[in-house]
Amino acid sequence: MIQGVIFDMDGLMFDTERIWNICWEPALAKFGLPCKDGLPQAARGTTKAGSCDVLRRFYGEDCPAMGIVEELYRLAYEAFNKPVPKMPGLDELLAWLDEHHIPMAVASSSPMTVIEGHLEHWGLGHYFKAVISGEHLTRSKPAPDIFLLAAQKLGTEPAKTMVLEDSYNGVRAGAAGGFVTVMVPDLSPATDEMRRIYTCECASLLEVRRKLEDGEL
């Protein structure tokens, strides 16, 4: 039986990944750079520092990585001033876990102000025993550090804790930490690599709830 559940946020709880995707092109254009194929996907699920590493990999060590990332975040923050929709099944899954007294945490690479803003807007903060941002951790996803810290705060063992993720880097992090890693794809479809390392794939959070109800997870 699962003893705890850790939620990623962007693209898993809220429909924010499309906003991040849209913001990459103008952020890069400000510095005279095109948006290369695969860049948004490679940076998905990482912190500011992780996104800088990805930019240097795509454009070279001399690219103004931090300037681009700061512009990316500025544009995204502007967009986040409007309500961002919840992903299908979020309310139902949270209610089921709460009813069954399974502790929950949010572990997101986004800054804490962004995480708290989304949770407060939808009135969901009370569900979570811990809310963790990766902005102050040394290692970003795909390292498992943020999930290990979340499990520690929940008081659960990784092998009995579910990680819900939509990004490749997040699935890699969950698998690396020894978690029950469930991929709920948003913009990134499951690949052969993901299928090798995740526990299972669900089409939505509604399916996650169904599998829990049926004892499949």
Residue ranges with predicted function:
Residues P34, V54-A95, H100:
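Metal-dependent phosphoesterase signature
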Residues M1-Q3, A95-D98, P111-L217:
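Asp-based, Mg2+/Mn2+-dependent phosphohydrolase catalytic module
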Residues M1-Q41:
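Active-site neighborhood of HAD-like aspartate-dependent phosphohydrolases
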Residues A27-G60, A65:
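Alpha-helical substrate-recognition element adjacent to the catalytic core
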Residues I19, A43-T47, L72, P85-G89, ...:
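Short beta->alpha linker loops
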Residues P34, P103, V180:
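Residue-level detector of anion-binding/catalytic polar loops
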Residues W20-W24, L28, K48-L55, V69-F80, ...:
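Hydrophobic alpha-helical core bundles mediating ligand binding, dimerization, or RNAP-core interactions
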Residues M13, K86, M104-A107, R139, ...:
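Conserved SAM-binding loop
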